[in-house]
A protein has these predicted regions:
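Short coil/turn connectors at secondary-structure junctions
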Residues: 12, 37, 66-68, 172-175
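Single conserved hydrophobic/aromatic residue that forms the stacking wall/gate
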Residues: 1-11
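Phosphate/pyrophosphate-binding betaalpha-module
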Residues: 162, 166-181, 189-192
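Enzymes and membrane/adaptor proteins characterized by extended Gly/Ser/Thr/Asp/Glu-rich
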Residues: 36-158, 181, 186-200
């Protein structure tokens, strides 16, 4: 709406946007060339096959004339996975890794290292260079389950520690990260995708 009111210059390159399908439409190409977003985020609706996704990410970089264009994805594992067509990591929720960290830190480090390496390899293969992890929301009782098993723990020290490890491991595997959620889903009583949460 702001862009259509002539404020495009102010917001140019200050935003991330998504696209509609498996390939770019003429309208989307025109929009991207005009407003030059900072990055593009992909969702399940954009991913069909490995080759198709590779062509899509290559097209985005070519159109925006940026070989290092930030191309983002939500690949948390568990119920938030955009790459289900290629991998099944439904078991590997953040809660799974948080519980494992509490029980056996050595096993956690081994499992988490292998997990991050596999996800990073697939992302690089697809031409994706940013994963929107880690989720740093603290799990709280009797609130909306938009977070739930997406949180590492109800213990803020564990969330912080695993968050640091997650960032470090992805960076070592050449994938940038974006922490979330800000200001935080942990205290939300409603799903912010559907309603506006009010946090006291």
């Amino acid at each position: 709406r702001l862009l259509s009111r002539g404020l495009g210059d102010v917001y140019k390159r200050q935003f991330i946007c998504g696209i509609k399908g498996y390939k770019l439409s003429k309208t989307e190409i025109k929009f991207l060339r005009k407003y030059k977003p900072w990055g593009i985020i992909l969702f399940s609706r954009n991913i069909k096959t490995i080759k198709q996704t590779q062509l899509l990410t290559k097209s985005l970089k070519n159109i925006l004339q940026n070989p290092t264009l930030p191309i983002l994805i939500d690949e948390e594992g568990g119920r938030v996975s955009r790459l289900r067509k290629f991998i099944d990591n439904s078991v590997f929720t953040n809660k799974y890794f948080g519980d494992l960290y509490k029980k056996d830190k050595k096993k956690f480090n081994l499992y988490f290292d292998v997990y991050v390496k596999q996800i990073s390899y697939l992302l690089r293969l697809l031409g994706i260079n940013v994963n929107t992890v880690p989720v740093l929301d603290i799990l709280r009782k009797n609130l909306h389950q938009i977070v739930g098993d997406r949180s590492f723990s109800s213990n803020k020290k564990i969330v912080s520690k695993i968050g640091d490890i997650c960032i470090d491991k992805f960076h070592k595997n050449k994938i940038a990260t974006i922490t979330k959620h800000i200001p935080g889903h942990g205290l939300a009583k409603v799903d912010s995708h559907l309603k506006l949460p009010i946090i006291d």
